[in-house]
Structures are given as C-alpha cells and as structure tokens.
Amino acid sequence: MVQIFKFLLKSSKSTGRAHFRPTFLDTLRLAVRGGHGGNGLPKYGGVGGQGGCVYLVAKEGLTLRKVVQGLKDKRVAASSGEDSSKASIFGRRGADQRIEVPVGVQVYDDQQKLIADLDEHEATCIVAGGGTGGCTATNFLGRPGENRTVNLDLKLIADVGLVGFPNAGKSTLLKAVSNAKPKIAAYPFTTIRPQIGTIEYRDLRSITVADLPGLIEGAHANFGMGHKFLKHIERTRLLVFMVDIFGFQLSPKHPHRDCLANVYALNKELELYDPSLLEKPSVLLLNKMDKEGAHEIFTKVKPLVSDLASGLEQCPEELRPKQVLNFDSIVPISAMNSSKITQVKSQLRRTLVRLAEKQFLADEDQVKEKLRQRVGVVGPKIT
C-alpha cells in the first residue's frame, strides 16, 4: 500500500512539473562569430578570402523552440576565408551561416541596442560580419570576424490580442471562436503561455487571435512576468478586453473589484506599460452573462464603460488612468455556452476591415504627396 501511494505521489508531481515546463520560448541568446579572413600572399600580391557572415532570416511557421532544436549548441560560426595561393591569387570567400528564425523576432546586442526588427517573411540581417582577407593594408594577414552575443526577443504577430485578468474566460472564448485547444479550468492562471488560434470564415478569410496569460495589477512593473506577456500585444492590430461581469478577486489577500473597476485597472496597466497601446482599436467583452443577475449588472455598467471619462471621479485613485480607452463596441457574452460568439466574430472582422481601409487611405495620401513633391509645380495636377 505504501509503495502504491509513493507511485501515485511521484506521478502527480511529474505531471505538475510537465504542466509548468516552459514549452513556449520567446527569448533566445546566441553566441555568433564571423569567419576569419584568409591570409594573403605577399610574394604575388595575393588577397585572402573574406570570412563568411552569420545571417538571421525570418521565416513564417517557425518557433524559437525549433531554432534551438536545430542547433547543436547556442554557438554559431561562419567559415573562414581561404588563403591566397599560386593557384588562386584571390582566396575564396568563407561560407555564410544562415539561421532561420520566426517572423516577429527583434535582435539586440549585449547593450540592449536594437540591431534589427525581423517583422516580415524573408527579412534578413547580418549579426556577425566576416573578417577582411589579408592584403597590403593588413600586412597580408587575415582579420578575425566579428564575435559577439545577440539576444532574440520574439513578439507574436497576430490580428487580435486578448487582454484580461485571470479567469476572465479568454481561453474559453479562444476555443469557441477558433481552432485552438487551450487548457480551460475554473481557477486563475490556467493559461501560462501565449496561445494563438485562427478564426476561419466561410469566404476563406482568416483572423489570428492571441490569448495571453492573465495579467495582475502591477504587470506594467513586471509583476507576474507582466512584461513577458504585455510585449506580445504590441504588434496586434486590435485589442479585445475580456472582463468578468461579476468582477474579479485574485486571492483572499486582494480586494474584490467590480466589473467597472477591472476595466479601469486594465486601462491603467496598459497606460503605464506603453501609452501608445491605448491608441489601438479596442473591443470590450463582458463575459459570464449566463449567470443569474448578470443582465442587471450589465444594464447599470454599460453607460459607464461606454464613456470611461465620465466615471473617473468615482474611480479609485490607484486605478485612475490619465487617458481612457474608447471601445469600438461593447458586447455582453457567455463564452461558456457560446452565446453571441457569431456576433463577436463578425464584430472583430468589421473592425479589422475598417482599420485596413483607413490604413489604405492613409498610404494612398502618402503616395500622392510623394508624387506631388517629385512632379513639382510644373507637372500635371494629381487629384
């Protein structure tokens, strides 16, 4: 009996560890070195081959986890250039090393200076240049290649980002609207790593949705790994705030905040982390409308969340933002029984289409302005 108990205890521990093991990787540190330049040949004035370079190339469908699995270790070196010889006065260039990384990776050096932002498919950057081949300027000695450490920081690229406190129902919504299968349970912090799902429409249009782990108050100051999660909404085009209509309490040690206070709290967290996020189009979903008393609360709170500025005086000072969100729409839903899910999908699409049209017109105006500047006052008028 004791042996059985020990076996069950061991099994439960291993399962717990497996659940919290970080399978999602969004940062990676690599040591990169360009190839050494080949030596020249003084007798004949020969020039050594240049050392190879280390490139990063953005590819869709990749993850940093796959990048790590494809490397023997986290050190990458390009080949050295060939020495000059009688048979080959100009030494051959060393072979380059190309590392494929996910789209959305930002590359930083050890001083946290941005080297490149690989936000498009096939975007490329050199992270370690090759050494110069030996020539008269170097006394015919090949120069060493660039040797340094780079940090890769992945920021997910999705159309929609789900934002909310723990246990608000974000994962349930993601499962209802998309093909994703996130873990769902009736306790906070079910989602411990970002999840991405795709909403597919009948006309083959698709929208990607990122479900981020629940935030806590103080996320802007990196409490609860807030920075690790908040950074992923920087590249999203539309923010969807998910709030429990009955409010939320993280633990018995924390105060219970009602629905309106939670909206202000989320507003404040984003403002303190990056005020520009408040300029993004946003939608508010008030969840758990299937429960008794939800409609009465919604009737009272809808006018207030429709105009957050009007209720700032009643908002607790620690939650009061300087700039308030202006929601494009407010939808009461029940993610559990899929109530109004079709309306949510339609609303997300309409908002993104409107945003794309606005961007198209802005780009068109920029093109016209550039043409006006090139043509000048003598050319034909462009309307």
UniProtKB/Swiss-Prot annotation:
Top-level taxon of origin: Eukaryota
Indicate what this protein is called per its UniProt record. GTP-binding protein 10 homolog
- Obg domain residues are 22-157
Answer whether the UniProt record assigns the keyword Nucleus to this protein: yes
Role description? May be involved in the ribosome maturation process.
Q: By its UniProt entry, which InterPro entries does this protein fall under?
A: G_OBG, GTP-bd, GTP-bd_Obg/CgtA, GTP1_OBG_dom, GTP1_OBG_dom_sf, OBG_GTPase, P-loop_NTPase
Ranges for domain OBG-type G come to 158-353
Asked if Aminoacyl-tRNA synthetase is a keyword of the record, the answer is no
